[in-house]
Amino acid sequence: MPIRIFSKEGLRERGASGKNEQKKKKKEKIRRSMKNLCRFVESYKDFTLYGYRFHSKIKHKFCVLSSSFPVLFFCHPLSPLKSNFIDRFTLDSHASQATWTLYMVVIVLFLSYRN
């Protein structure tokens, strides 16, 4: 069986090309995920939501930004909350009511993940 001898330069070139491909794949993954990020502004009575909705295969993230509080919602993709969670849990402009609503969402999601 013949013995192959590699120079250090050849090994360095191979390692560098592998790293470049990994960087390209990582950039492509980030670019694809940014496509799924869509900005939304939704108005409800006495309350307006400003934020970003991120859709992925694993979970749905709703980042709700308002003048009174920032909230990050995590919903399972199969959950009925993913599309109309704001309708089910009405958010109010008062921070205390909004905090209570957040607790309700967390409790419901916790109970749904236990099954």
UniProtKB/Swiss-Prot annotation:
Residues 9-30 are annotated as: Disordered. Encoded in the first intron of MPT5. This is Putative uncharacterized protein YGL177W. The lineage of its organism: Eukaryota, Fungi, Dikarya, Ascomycota, Saccharomycotina.
